[in-house]
C-alpha cells in the first residue's frame, strides 16, 4: 500500500518520458521503453509517476539494467510477474520541473506536438502530430489539413533551425518554416 504522503504528491506539469513494457522473468521485472534522447537518461529524472484507474501514483525505482537490447526495471513492491503485468503499458511520467532547462533554440518534442506549421508566405501546412529522429536531425511529422491544396495527407519537414525552421512561437503554438508546400 502507498503511504498518504506519497499519494498526495502529483506531477503539476506531467511529462511522459516512456512507458513500461511486458514483464520479464518471475520476480517482477519489467521492460521499459524510454523516449528520452539517450535511453538511459530516463533514470536521471525521478520520482516517476504512473496513472492507474485515473489516480496518480508515485513508483519507486529499485533497480535497472540492460538485458540484450532492452532496458529492464525493478520497482519497489512489484515482486512477481502478476504485479508486473498490471503495469504493462503504463506511461512513465515525471513533473516537468525535473527536466533540465533548455538552451535558446532547443525545444522539448512534447512542446512542439499540436503546433500549427505555416510557411513564411502564410500557407498552412498542418499540425505537428509526431517527431522522428533520423540521426542527422529531427523531423516534424505534420498532418495536413483535409482541404490541402496539394492533396497531401502528411508532410515530413526537417527540424533545421534557421535553415528550415524560421520561428517557433510556443505561446501561439505556431512554427514558421521555409518549406515548399508541394512537398
From Swiss-Prot:
Q: Which GO terms describe its molecular function?
A: ribosome binding
* PANTHER family linked: RIBOSOME MATURATION FACTOR RIMM
- Does the entry feature the keyword Cytoplasm, yes or no? yes
Its gene name is rimM
Record GO cellular component, one term: cytoplasm
Compartments reported by the entry: Cytoplasm
Q: What is the lineage of its organism?
A: Bacteria, Pseudomonadati, Pseudomonadota, Gammaproteobacteria, Enterobacterales
Briefly state the protein's biological role: An accessory protein needed during the final step in the assembly of 30S ribosomal subunit, possibly for assembly of the head region. Essential for efficient processing of 16S rRNA. May be needed both before and after RbfA during the maturation of 16S rRNA. It has affinity for free ribosomal 30S subunits but not for 70S ribosomes.
Say which domain of life the source belongs to.
Bacteria
In the UniProt record, does the keyword Chaperone occur?
A: yes
- Which residue range or ranges hold the PRC barrel domain? 104-183
Q: What does UniProt say about this protein's domains?
A: The PRC barrel domain binds ribosomal protein uS19.
Instruction: Look up the record and give one Gene Ontology term from the biological process aspect.
Output: ribosomal small subunit biogenesis
Indicate the principal place this protein occupies in or around the cell. Answer: cytoplasm
The UniProt entry, under InterPro entries, shows:
PRC_barrel-like_sf, PRC_RimM, RimM, RimM_N, RimM_N_sf, Transl_B-barrel_sf
Q: Partners and quaternary state?
A: Binds ribosomal protein uS19.
What is this protein's name?
Ribosome maturation factor RimM
Question: Pfam families, alphabetically?
Answer: PRC_RimM, RimM
